Amino acid sequence: MPDADSARATAREAIALLTGAAGFTEHRPPPRPLPPDGPLGWAGYDAARERASARTGEEESVVYGTGVVGDRACVLISFEFGFLGGSLGRNTGDRLAAAYELALARRLPLVALVATGGSRMQEGMVALTQLQRVAAASTRLRAAGLPQIAVVRDPTTGGGWATVGAGADVVLALPGAQVGFAGSRVRPPHADPYAYSAEGQFAAGQVDAVVPADELAATVTQWLRALGPHEDLPAAPVPRALPTAGAEPTAGVGTGSAAGTEAASGTGSAAGAGTEAASGTGSAAGAGTEAASGTGSAAGGGAVAPLPGTGREAVARARDPRRPRAEAYLADYFAVRLPLHGDRSGATDPGLLCGLGLRADGQPVAYVAQCGTPTRPAGYRAAARTIRLADRLGVPVLTLVDTPGAANDAEAERAGAGAAIADTFAAIAAARVPVTTLVIGEGGSGGALALAAPENTHVTVDSYFSVIAPELAAAILKRPPSETGATADQLRLRPQDLVELGFALSIVG
């Protein structure tokens, strides 16, 4: 069921849900009178508009203007579902286009509170073509580096979902809302209703978070802080190393190379990204916040673990289940995390975490983090989506590499593994913002390399990176299992090897 507090909130009630006492300044475009009964001369259309206006107090199905959410100014759009089902007609298009232009002129983010049944049939093709106007206006905002957030209410269907809703950079949904291109009266009679719900769209990777009404203002505020707009943000600092559970650290061990080392005192990385750390607790689940505090060096602020003596040892340490994983690194690095969920093509990969986060000092950083599992095509598509969003908004990117490789099962091939990996390589190659990479575990061939930043990759002492897993290399060379260790040494996959080969800038102890 829809969220009781906001399922059928009016347009202005929905705005007040975000702005509270901060207020809202309404804007209106120059009026354009419609011909009698609209462009189609639809009998009774004028009377229906008059009844809708008397019932809602609105002149159209959209209200827009400027407001403050938390501490962030923005342009707000809110649909009035009580006015002809929140449908889009010519005058609605005028208001939507004007709202996007207002955001562009004032360089403000745009937040849309959507509740609509789609295009207004009483205006026919004149109504339908308003979707093209919205798409064009949204594209201009994207080109200007201005973020768009959609909050989809109940119901959000048809062209409104396919433009203002699903076309936003971040899509939040209220619990239980009906969300889908096909409305309830036009979908197949036996269609699964879950697929058309906020929760179903979240499961399919089309919605970033389902947020209760009483958490919406705080969540949108955090997103506005993270998304900006921003200018000239520094590179993401290299995360500090985290100790392996139950392991005893050994005092300062060098990398054995002049190519770039970081001492336990934390003097900074060879990439010039700086050294900064945070510690805290929290969960990656949902759109909530996670506390973090403190500072330290990229080397962990103290003693460091010894480097692996052999290739076999490096692989064993990277595969050690006690080794800290992406979740621990992200919780330590960020004060607040805001997940981006799904690939927008109908799938998700729980083994890859994406989103934007705020550090303890307020700096926003986008993150893409592998969790130690084979990365699926949906994961690579979500990664590319995150990197391109960050690049467009001027937000630096942090990637955490940890995978035995890309998923290689038949389903992954059918889902376009090759194209998805290629797209991730391209997203990083084209990024204008700085990308920082830390290899925290397994670096399994191209499936890992797709997320690595050329010339700004760092490694932990518990990591390795290889063109192929040593077991597979030995098998290809028809060597017995007893020679796997020697093969690992030949591959030169240890952290210190990666620095000496010029792949990694430094070892984070």
Protein language model regions, located:
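Amphipathic alpha-helical segments at domain termini/boundaries
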Residues: M1-D37, A182-G252, G294-D349, P454, ...
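Glycine-rich, flexible beta-strand/loop modules in the N-terminal catalytic cores of phosphate-handling
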Residues: E50-R51, T56-T66, I77-L88, T373
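Glycine-rich anion/phosphate-binding loops
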Residues: T56-S61, S87-A98, G342-G351, T375-R385
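A structural preference for short, pocket-lining loop segments at secondary-structure junctions
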Residues: G67-E80, R95-R120, L356-C371, G379-N408
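Flexible beta-alpha connector loops of hexameric P-loop NTPases
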Residues: L84-N91, E123-V126, T373-A378, A410-G418
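Conserved catalytic cores of soluble enzyme domains
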Residues: G117-A235, P404-G509
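A structural preference for long, well-packed, hydrophobic secondary-structure segments
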Residues: T139-A143, Q370-V397, A415, A426-V433, ...
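Long, intrinsically disordered low-complexity tandem-repeat segments
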Residues: A247-A299, T310
